Each structure stands twice: as C-alpha cells, then as structure tokens.
From Swiss-Prot:
Location of the active site: 187, 194
Residues holding NADP(+): 13-18, 36-38, 78-80, 106
Catalysed transformations (reactions): 6-phospho-D-gluconate + NADP(+) = D-ribulose 5-phosphate + CO2 + NADPH
Organism listed in the record: Schizosaccharomyces pombe (strain 972 / ATCC 24843) (Fission yeast)
InterPro entries tied to this protein: 6-PGluconate_DH-like_C_sf (IPR008927), 6PGD_dom2 (IPR013328), 6PGDH_C (IPR006114), 6PGDH_Gnd/GntZ (IPR006113), 6PGDH_NADP-bd (IPR006115), 6PGdom_BS (IPR006184), NAD(P)-bd_dom_sf (IPR036291), Pgluconate_DH (IPR006183)
Record-given protein name: 6-phosphogluconate dehydrogenase, decarboxylating
Length: 492
C-alpha cells in the first residue's frame, strides 16, 4: 500500500445524505475519502463538518481512486438515472479487477441488473444498495440493503454492517439481499410499503379531524398513546410531532400545508411491478393513486362545489371509534406488509433470487422509515418457517387480524357514511376478504371473456363431465344452447 492509499472506502456525492454517511463512517473508525463533482463542496465539507475527523478529500476522480485501499470500495450517492451511468463511465477506466462500485441511490432495479452485467465484463464488482433512514439514519445508522455481484460482499460486509443501524440483540440492519438488482428491488418494495403506511396514517388522521372534529393536539395525543403499543413505529412517532408543530401565529403548521402530495416514483415502480407480476399489491397501489388524486387540487375544489355526498357529523361513541381506528390501522398495516412480502416472493421466483425474508424484515427493524415494532414479529415468523407463504398464515398475524377486524369493518363503514375517503384502509379490507374467499365471482368473468372473445375457460373438477371435460380449455357458443365445445390455447 502506498502512502496515498489511506481510505477504507470512498464516497461520491456530498449532499446531506452523503455527508452524513461519511461522518457516520468516520465516527465508527473508518478513514473515508470524499469527492463531489462541484469540488468547492469538498473543501467546504472538510473545513466544517469533517474538520478534525478521519476524512480526506479529492478534487478529481483520479485523486479519489488513488486514495482508496485495495480492493477499492467506491460508494455513489448521487441522483438516480443518467448521473449514475456518467459517473460509472468516469470511474471504471480508473479501477482494477476486483474493485467495487456501490450505488446507494434510489435506482430502479433493472438498471442495477444491467450495470452488474456490464461491469462484470470488466472485472469490476457492482453492488446496488438500498439506503433507508433519511438524513438522521445516514448519520447514525441506516438500514442497508445490498445486492448485486456476490463476490463484493466479503469486502463490503464489515463496512456496511458497522455503518448500519442495530436492532434486537445488536444485530445489524444489513445483510446480503441477493444477486443482480435484488437490493434495489427490496428497497423499492420498502418504499412502496412506506407509501401505504403513510396513506393509512393520513386516512386515520382525516377521520379524527373531519369526522370527529378533533384538534391537531388531540389527534397527536392519540398517536402518542398508540406509539406505546402495537402501532409503535417511526411514522407514528413523527406524525405526533408534525401535528404538534406550531407556525409563528401559534396555529398548527400542518393545517397551512397545501394538500397536494408529491412523489419521486418508487411507489409507482412498486405498483407497476405488481401489475407486471400479476400480484395483487392493492393497498400500495391505492396509496399511489391517493397521491395522484391529491395533486388535482383545483379540480377537487371545483368538484366540491358540484358533487354532493354525505355531510353528517359522527354522533356515536367517540372513544369506541378511536379504538376502532387503532385496530383498522393495525390490520391494514399487516395487509400492506403481507402484500409487500408476497411481491418479493414472486420476484424471487421470476428472477431466481434467494431472498431471505427474515433477514429483510430484520433490515427494516431499525434505521429505516418503516421501522416498527411488529417487524420483529415478521422476522420471527420467517425464522420459524423460511417458506411461509404469507405472514397472514402465521398465528401472530392471523390472531392479530382476527381481533382487529370488527373495528376495521366499522371504520370502513363509518367512513363511507361520513363521506370521508379511506382508499388504502378499505382496499386492505377488500383484499383480506378476497384472500380468505374460497370462491370468487371470477367464474362469471371467465364466462364473459369467453362469450365476447372466445378466450376459453376451465371447469371445476367436481363439475366436470363428458360435455365439460376437466383440465381442458373450453369454448362455448353462448348464443345457442350448449354444444360447439372446442379446445383452444388459453389466453389469460
């Protein structure tokens, strides 16, 4: 090792997340090299936040690479998309076989798979790692979800598991996820669940605010109480804080915020992928659509003056409804996570990934936005049965939904009577009822498809006979009286 090769790893991208991850590394005993395309930011960082710490700077990619111990570990925290490709194009010629590039941004998993394959041809090991926890998580311990070229894991494991948050018995919220784009895929699903959790909380707030006429402080008190029990989570905690925050005039700041939600696309990716996989991730998808509907602010204002609906106030037992809301939120969250793990199960089959669901749940227990107390129970469920088909089949969650569902149903019914939209809460309940139904009306749907498009259908084994044979794709002439049965290629 030359005197120049001093850094245990390097990081490119000095926005707040990048700076905080570097400071996290320095605090935990690593020497870190930093670089930014706008090199003045390197100097500013070294002169301020990084001053006196084991952090060195570089003013070019060449200098950056020269300061890294071999095999080199280069972490990129830059905007997803073309900026990542441009940076890789600049870095790759400077690296040697066995060196590692880690993309820690919110990249789309197919891009990560492509980059893995392209860089493997050059002998460079590529990793796409989900990073969750926001600015504070990056600074003190994020959830890290690395996947890509498995040959990189032995080198980056001690770095990543040291940087990561700890949960349970000091277990790091980081483990190897899988090959290709598996790490970024799991982060995508994490973000989809995050969309679902946030929408569920907003719907719960809306019923308390508009349905019960509660103040923000009163609602904050409810969330604070819930955060000591089965709903204990980061998002419940920050919701309490947000509701209590006052503007300069002493009024709740949240009431002054425009009700048009933004989104960066990762929730949409989850919904799109669910459709491609044919997996009913309905709650997360409704959460995405709820943001889309919120963005139609001016149109909604016009609609509010033209379209009628219930305008009644709740007159029942307020305490009972608040208790029901707790149950509805809890049960709906279980559905959201069940759907997320269902989607990852299908992705593992599709892409040949060996996903460790217990490990994924553990990664999400600390440091990340969706961290919550019941992730411990998901971890334990998958440790007991790594092949668990659905978390809904584990006794803890089966019993949890069983106890909560009466209140859940009352909330959905009451929201409808009050005219308050609860798209995520209601679709969660609809999924639950559909999932537990041995018989669904898809038989009629199949008949309709065969009637207008000759798409064929199959019959129930117990209903089969000579005219309607089992295990055959059947087409009927629906305008006659039976007959004209023909087998064709089944087209779903």
């Amino acid at each position: 090792m030359s005197q120049k090769e001093v850094a245990d790893f390097g990081l490119i991208g000095l926005a707040v997340m990048g700076q905080n991850l570097i400071l996290n590394g320095a605090d935990k005993g690593f020497t870190v090299c930093c670089y930014n395309r706008t090199t003045s930011r390197v100097d500013e960082f070294l002169a301020n936040e990084a001053k006196g710490k084991s952090i060195v700077g570089a003013h070019s990619l060449e200098e950056f690479v020269s300061k890294l111990k071999k095999p080199r570990v280069c972490i990129l925290l830059v905007k997803a998309g073309k900026p990542v490709d441009y940076l890789i194009e600049g870095l790759a010629p400077l690296l040697e076989k066995g060196d590692i590039i880690v993309d820690g941004g919110n990249s789309h998993y197919p891009d990560t798979t492509r980059r893995c394959e392209e860089l493997a041809k050059k002998g460079i090991l590529f990793v796409g790692s989900g990073v969750s926890g926001g600015e504070e998580g990056a600074r003190y311990g994020p959830s890290l979800m690395p996947g890509g070229n498995p040959a990189a894991w032995p080198r980056i494991k001690p770095i990543f598991q040291t940087l990561a948050a700890k949960a349970g018995n000091n277990e790091p919220c980081c483990d190897w996820v899988g090959e290709q784009g598996a790490g970024h895929y799991v982060k995508m699903v994490h973000n989809g669940i995050e969309y679902g959790d946030m929408q569920l909380i907003c719907e719960t707030y809306d019923i308390m605010k508009r349905g019960l006429g509660m103040s923000c402080d009163e609602i904050a008190d409810v969330f604070e109480k819930w955060n000591t029990g089965k709903l204990d989570s980061f998002l419940i905690e920050i919701t309490r804080d947000v509701l209590r925050y006052k503007a300069d005039d002493g009024k709740p700041l949240v009431e002054k915020i425009l009700d048009a939600a933004g989104q960066k696309g990762t929730g949409k990716w989850t919904a799109q992928n669910a459709l491609e996989m044919g997996t009913p991730v309905s709650l997360i998808t409704e959460a995405v659509f709820a943001r889309c509907l919120s963005s139609l602010k001016s149109e909604r204002v016009r609609a509010s003056k033209k379209l009628t609906g219930p305008n009644t106030k709740f007159t029942g037992d307020k305490k009972q409804l608040i208790d029901d809301l707790e149950d509805a939120l809890y049960a709906s969250k279980i559905i959201s996570y069940a759907q997320g793990f269902m989607l990852m199960r299908e992705a593992a089959k599709e892409y040949g990934w060996k996903l460790n669901n217990a490990g994924i749940a553990l990664m999400w227990r600390g440091g990340c936005i969706i961290r919550s107390v019941f992730l411990k129970d998901i971890t334990e469920a998958f440790r007991e049965d790594p092949n668990l088909e659905s978390i809904l089949f584990h006794p803890f969650f089966t019993n949890g939904v069983e106890k909560a569902q009466a209140g859940w149903r009352r909330v959905v019914a009451q929201a409808a009577m009050l005219g308050i939209p609860v798209p995520a809460t209601s679709t969660g309940l609809s999924f639950y009822d559909g999932y537990r139904s041995a018989v669904l009306p898809a038989n009629l749907l199949q008949a309709q498809r065969d009637y207008f498009g000759a798409h064929t259908f199959r019959v129930l084994p117990e209903a089969a006979d000579k005219s309607l044979p089992a295990d055959k794709d059947i087409h009927i002439n629906w305008t006659g009286h039976g007959g004209n049965i023909s087998a064709t290629t089944y087209d779903a």
